[in-house]
């Protein structure tokens, strides 16, 4: 599957980025290269290959370094107000953000 110029223009519009004609051409070539690589990977026979959860897990024991799931600070109305003071807009104790998905 190859992307054409209209596909790249649509992707740029959805990503909300503006591309010059030269950038659009380079992006088209790079994206088509990535899609070609994906097609090659999909063609590889992986029958009988054990799945990996992590690429290094086949060579060493991987232990996740996670912190204890504990409250680190008591949530108070004063703390909430302090945090919301950093927001450009807030309502009902929540951060308001601009709509980014059509």
Swiss-Prot record:
Classification via InterPro entries: Asp/Glu-ADT_sf_sub_c (IPR036113), GatC (IPR003837)
Presence of the UniProt keyword Protein biosynthesis in the record: yes
SUPFAM superfamilies given in the database record = Glu-tRNAGln amidotransferase C subunit
Is the keyword Nucleotide-binding in the record?
A: yes
Q: List keywords of the entry alphabetically.
A: ATP-binding, Ligase, Nucleotide-binding, Protein biosynthesis
Per the UniProt entry, the Enzyme Commission number(s) are 6.3.5.-
One GO term in the molecular function aspect is:
asparaginyl-tRNA synthase (glutamine-hydrolyzing) activity
Name a single GO biological process.
Answer: glutaminyl-tRNAGln biosynthesis via transamidation
Q: Which catalysed reactions does the entry list for this protein? A: L-glutamyl-tRNA(Gln) + L-glutamine + ATP + H2O = L-glutaminyl-tRNA(Gln) + L-glutamate + ADP + phosphate + H(+); L-aspartyl-tRNA(Asn) + L-glutamine + ATP + H2O = L-asparaginyl-tRNA(Asn) + L-glutamate + ADP + phosphate + 2 H(+)
Q: List the disulfide bonds.
A: none
Q: What does this protein do?
A: Allows the formation of correctly charged Asn-tRNA(Asn) or Gln-tRNA(Gln) through the transamidation of misacylated Asp-tRNA(Asn) or Glu-tRNA(Gln) in organisms which lack either or both of asparaginyl-tRNA or glutaminyl-tRNA synthetases. The reaction takes place in the presence of glutamine and ATP through an activated phospho-Asp-tRNA(Asn) or phospho-Glu-tRNA(Gln).
Stored HAMAP family: GatC
Q: Which family does it belong to?
A: Belongs to the GatC family.
> Whom does it interact with, and what assembly results?
Heterotrimer of A, B and C subunits.
Name by which UniProt lists this protein: Aspartyl/glutamyl-tRNA(Asn/Gln) amidotransferase subunit C
Q: Which organism is it from?
A: Bordetella pertussis (strain Tohama I / ATCC BAA-589 / NCTC 13251)
């Amino acid at each position: 599957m190859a992307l054409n110029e209209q596909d790249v223009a649509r992707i740029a519009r959805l990503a909300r980025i503006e591309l010059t004609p030269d950038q659009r051409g380079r992006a088209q070539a790079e994206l088509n290269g990535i899609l070609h690589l994906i097609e090659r990977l999909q063609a590889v026979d992986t029958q009988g290959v054990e799945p990996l959860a992590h690429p290094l897990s086949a060579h060493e024991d991987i232990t996740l370094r996670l912190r204890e799931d504990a409250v680190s600070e008591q949530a108070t109305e004063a703390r909430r107000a302090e945090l919301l003071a950093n927001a450009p807009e807030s309502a009902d104790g929540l951060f308001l953000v601009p709509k980014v998905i059509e």
